[in-house]
Regions:
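Protein kinase catalytic-loop region centered on the HRD/HxD motif
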Residues: 303-311
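C-lobe/activation-segment region of protein kinase-like
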Residues: 329-397
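A conserved alpha-helical element in kinase catalytic cores
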Residues: 231-264, 293
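ATP-binding glycine-rich loop module of kinase domains
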Residues: 194-242
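Conserved SAM/SAH cofactor-binding pocket of Class I
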Residues: 6-83, 88-91, 97-98
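Conserved structural core of kinase catalytic domains
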Residues: 260-294
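Conserved Class I SAM-dependent methyltransferase catalytic core
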Residues: 13, 116-173
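Mobile active-site "lid"/loop adjacent to the S-adenosyl-L-methionine
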Residues: 93-119
């Protein structure tokens, strides 16, 4: 069990002032933070949890001895047994980088010191009330920049409440709350929001959306779908990138193309998550006939884009722009660079891509006559004859 030290005292000062509502003390140890919260008139029920059985037994004995009310001590690994949402979540995690020769869960937070904190931030929004706050302590030894990166990636915001410097480290206490964006996303019934990937202009998050909450019905059936959330990167200089992509998704969705747009606001858009493999990964796992069918289908989608007079701009190198789903259907994603043009080149660009992956296709017993393909691409560019696409598919041998 972790006995109170300087870090515990520093955090306790803030807990005694700021704890309110339903309180969760994670990694309670001696129970110093839970007891401090209990002493605040603004606090209601206090739940103290720890992975250490001895710590929970000792705290329960203290609760009985003092005949304390409105406090429970439970064994839990982070949020494992912490049900419901909380107005205040307190966490003084083990924050030292792992010492290879010593195993002590009470002081070591992982290889670099921040891994346990990363798990915490990935889960905390599901347990924090919309107006809730996190009181979080960490050390300079943990890497302050990394902690702030984890906070930001999870769409949270922070402010410094207190700090204390020692000869070998500096301690910080942060108040962390949900960002306005996160609160708005959760108000839209998006749950389990997690960072997924970073693009040139946007950041992608995944979430689960309970559509039954969005439609008034007499039936209680829960229909959850996996969704992707795209928000503009804070460091991106692109103007109106969200509005631009929403515009084109509306257009291509009418043709059965692109991920299905669900809803949007000025600074984010939400669409159905496309589960599957990127095109080259998929090709490596498939047979010759399946690959031909997919290439034909993609050329068909490119033809639709050309017919609409729009250019996706990425089809000559669409490694991250085409996903093949589990039922072997190609889906074009990421329309943020799409432009309107009287000279669309989606078909010709994708034919060029086919020529460039000659070795990957050859490994699957599929040969493409590059000279003939490029000749057909030029003919299509000059004439717009859609029959040329059939000839392009037939040029594989």
């Amino acid at each position: 069990m972790y006995e109170p030290r300087e870090d515990s005292i520093l955090l306790e000062k803030q807990v005694s002032k700021l704890a309110f509502g339903r309180v969760l003390d994670l990694g309670t140890g001696s129970g110093i933070q839970a007891l401090a919260a209990l002493g605040n008139h603004d606090a209601g029920e206090v739940i103290a949890v720890d992975i250490d059985d001895e710590a929970i037994i000792a705290l329960n004995d203290l609760i009985k001895l003092r005949k304390l009310r409105k406090i429970k001590a439970l064994r839990s690994n982070l949020f494992e047994n912490a049900d419901g949402k909380f107005n205040t979540i307190i966490f003084n995690p083990p924050y030292l980088p792992q010492d290879k020769n010593i195993e002590d869960k009470a002081i070591y937070g992982g290889k670099h010191g921040w891994e346990l904190s990363e798990q915490f931030f990935n889960q905390v929004s599901q347990h924090l009330a919309a107006d809730g706050r996190i009181l979080f302590l960490f050390s300079s030894l943990t890497n302050r920049a990394k902690i702030e990166e984890l906070i930001n990636l999870n769409l949270l915001q922070f402010r410094l409440l207190g700090q204390q410097k020692f000869s070998f480290e500096e301690l910080y206490v942060y108040e962390i709350t949900k960002s306005d964006l996160l609160r708005r996303l959760e108000a839209r019934q998006l749950e389990q929001i997690h960072y997924f990937a970073k693009g040139q202009r946007g950041m992608i998050y995944t979430a689960w959306l309970d559509q039954s909450k969005l439609v008034k019905t007499h039936f209680a059936a829960k229909k959850q779908i996996k969704a992707a959330i795209k928000i503009k990167r804070p460091d991106s200089k692109a103007q109106q990138s969200i509005e631009h992509e929403v515009h084109w998704l509306k257009i291509v969705n009418k043709q059965g193309l692109g991920p299905k747009l669900l809803f949007y606001e000025e600074d984010f858009l939400v669409y159905e998550f496309v589960e599957g493999l990127f095109i080259l990964e998929w090709i490596k796992l498939q047979d010759r006939s399946s690959i031909i069918l997919i290439l034909k289908s993609i050329l068909g989608q490119c033809l639709i884009l050309d017919t609409l007079g729009i250019n996706k701009e990425e089809m000559h190198h669409p490694l991250k722009h085409i996903i093949i789903t589990k039922d072997n259907k190609p889906a074009l994603i990421d329309f943020e660079r799409t432009v309107e043009t009287n000279k669309p080149k989606n078909v010709t660009q994708f034919i060029e891509f086919i020529c460039r992956i000659e070795e990957e296709l050859k490994a699957k017993g599929l040969k493409a006559d590059k000279a003939r393909l490029r000749e057909l691409a030029k003919e299509y560019k000059d004439s717009g004859d859609q029959q040329i696409i059939k000839e392009a598919v037939n040029s594989f041998y």
